[in-house]
């Protein structure tokens, strides 16, 4: 199994991850916004404080995550996100062990972090629950395709 680590994201990570993005993440991004994988990653990279990249040895970006401030003047709320490639599976045990630490790192300055997730994405929903997120409501017609999404929050 490959060794992994997390580092601050670099602009070129967006195109590398986008070209190999997991089909579940591609479907979720499309259903939510009709954005391409590259557009979604670039938006997250530009607006996150800070964006972080998950690396598989030797130096292969396999995921990116961050939190985007949602409040003006008083940054107490953030949208949290993560997108990845199938290669994240190669560092899955380390990823799971370190997930809670990195969640604290990217959300420590906020009172509340939240987002929505495609209801079809059962694996990610289980992971969010394991991280301590609460699923607060189903949105039956979210995004341009009016797909069912679930809003989640961590306070």
Annotate the PLM regions.
Residues 3-19, 28-30:
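A short beta-loop-alpha structural element at the N-terminal edge
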Residues 53, 59-70, 78-79:
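Conserved beta-strand in the GNAT
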Residues 75-89, 94, 150:
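Conserved acetyl-CoA binding element of GNAT-fold acetyltransferases
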Residues 91-105, 126, 130:
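Conserved acetyl-CoA-binding loop-helix of GNAT-fold acetyltransferases
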Residues 110-129, 134, 141-143:
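Conserved beta-strand-loop-alpha-helix junction that forms the acyl-donor binding cleft
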Residues 41-54, 63, 111:
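A short helix-loop-beta-strand connector motif used in the catalytic cores of GNAT acetyltransferases and
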Residues 25-42:
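Conserved GNAT-fold acetyl-CoA-binding loop/helix
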Residues 141-155:
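C-terminal "cap" of GNAT-fold acetyltransferases
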